[in-house]
């Protein structure tokens, strides 16, 4: 019996290993086609080489990490916006003691309720010390809160004031990609995540 040449043997072994590794991989375009913004989904996720070999959960984790970076940027933009518009002549003056200005108070409360707080919640929910914790935190957030998230920073934007930064403007890539991430996360088999113990996911400051 003729012995198989060593080169052929290792070539076949490599092919088998690659096939096994890719066995659980999902088609990126097909997965993204289920989201509301498939082109954005493909464009963002394909930039990460790991997306080519990722299974459903792996793809969701890549999306979560990307959305987390966007959330940090958005959170900074929100704080910069609040700081830049908080003197006595601008819309968020209630935060600096001008309680007599009813409109300023309304604007300030609106900004907190529809812009600052929801974005902070997203930033914290997309955090985890490891992949498992990050996935559970994001999954619980999307299944419990995101469907009711009425985030709209422009709702409180007064005509004549400087335009909001792109990342927190209506229809921004951050807003769209959060919807993409939600869909990808909720498609991972395994069912809903039970409520976490108090403060288990209350982090996201790193």
Task: Provide a role label for each language-model segment.
Residues 1-26, 204-206:
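Terminal membrane/secretory targeting segments in land-plant proteins
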Residues 22-206:
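Folded extracytoplasmic luminal domains of secretory or organellar precursors
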């Amino acid at each position: 019996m003729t012995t198989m040449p060593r080169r052929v043997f290792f070539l076949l072994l490599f092919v088998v290993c690659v096939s096994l590794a890719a066995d659980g991989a999902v088609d990126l375009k097909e997965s993204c086609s289920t989201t509301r913004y498939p082109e954005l989904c493909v464009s963002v996720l394909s930039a990460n080489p790991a997306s080519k070999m990722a299974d459903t959960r792996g793809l969701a984790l890549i999306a979560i990490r990307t959305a987390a970076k966007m959330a940090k940027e958005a959170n900074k933009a929100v704080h910069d916006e609040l700081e830049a518009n908080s003197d006595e002549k601008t819309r968020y003056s209630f935060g600096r003691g001008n309680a007599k200005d009813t409109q300023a108070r309304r604007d300030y409360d609106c900004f907190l309720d529809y812009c600052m707080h929801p974005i902070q919640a997203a930033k914290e929910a997309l955090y985890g010390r490891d992949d498992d914790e990050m996935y559970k935190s994001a999954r619980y957030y999307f299944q419990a809160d995101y469907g009711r998230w009425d985030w709209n920073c422009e709702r409180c934007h007064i005509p004549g004031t400087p335009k909001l930064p792109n990342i927190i403007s209506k229809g921004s890539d951050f807003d769209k990609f959060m919807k993409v991430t939600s869909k990808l996360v909720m498609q991972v088999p395994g069912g809903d995540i039970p409520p976490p113990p108090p403060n288990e996911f209350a982090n996201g400051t790193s």
